[in-house]
């Protein structure tokens, strides 16, 4: 059943395209927007446009940052431990580790994991950019790379692939400790568990 308004139905269709949003939820969101003051709708529209126009990827770690703030705040900070790089799948996973307040090193965001079934290979994620941060035969300063990917089949496959590439570079390659349920997503794991996983990391 559709509303007798093309504009409203179009908005519902657009909301329904979002991950985790079914049509009923999309209808509730659209009706909420419809009954809010026009200024609220304008602010939402501006925020949507701004995130597409003003958010870029840090040229060093590939994390998200604002235009004009590259490198990102973490890469630019002199307080971070530059000898350690924690590799994560997404910016959301990076944020999960930051919330613990325990990890003080740098990050590298892959923006995905290797998944042959989905047609995603090493060239489709930020592997080359990671290797470029640890040049062979040069004093990059990096002493350890921590593989902190989600405990899924794809995450494990990606970790094994990265370990094979990184070990010959003469650095320590470690992995966050087990304790996170298989198939779980790091963004939903509590901070205490993430902290223990990072502190108890093991050599790959």
From Swiss-Prot:
Gene3D superfamilies: 3.40.1360.10, 6.10.250.240, RecR Domain 1. SMART domains: TOPRIM. GO terms for biological process: DNA recombination; DNA repair. GO terms for molecular function: DNA binding; zinc ion binding. PROSITE patterns: TOPRIM. Keywords: DNA damage, DNA recombination, DNA repair, Metal-binding, Zinc, Zinc-finger. Residues 83-181 form the Toprim domain. A zinc finger (C4-type) spans 58-75. It holds the Pfam family Toprim_4. Signal peptide: none annotated. It comes from the Bacteria. May play a role in DNA repair. It seems to be involved in an RecBC-independent recombinational process of DNA repair. It may act with RecF and RecO. Belongs to the RecR family. This is Recombination protein RecR. It comes from Chlorobium chlorochromatii (strain CaD3).
């Amino acid at each position: 059943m559709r509303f007798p308004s093309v504009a409203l139905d179009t908005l519902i269709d657009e909301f329904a395209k979002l991950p985790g949003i079914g049509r009923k939820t999309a209808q509730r969101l659209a009706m909420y927007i419809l009954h809010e003051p026009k200024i609220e709708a304008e602010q939402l529209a501006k925020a949507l446009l701004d995130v597409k126009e003003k958010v870029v990827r840090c040229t060093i770690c590939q994390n998200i940052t604002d235009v004009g703030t590259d490198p990102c705040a973490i890469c630019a900070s002199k307080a971070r431990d530059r000898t350690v790089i924690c590799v994560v799948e997404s910016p959301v996973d990076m944020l999960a580790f930051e919330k613990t307040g325990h990890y003080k090193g740098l990050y590298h965001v892959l923006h995905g994991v290797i998944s042959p079934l989905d047609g995603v290979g090493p060239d489709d994620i930020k592997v080359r950019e990671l290797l470029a941060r640890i040049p062979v035969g040069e004093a990059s300063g990096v002493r350890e790379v921590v593989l902190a990917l989600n405990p899924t089949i794809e995450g494990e496959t990606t970790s094994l692939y990265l370990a094979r590439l990184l070990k010959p570079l003469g650095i320590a390659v470690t992995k966050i400790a087990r304790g996170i349920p298989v198939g779980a997503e790091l963004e939903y794991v509590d901070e205490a568990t993430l902290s223990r996983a990072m502190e108890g990391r093991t050599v790959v």
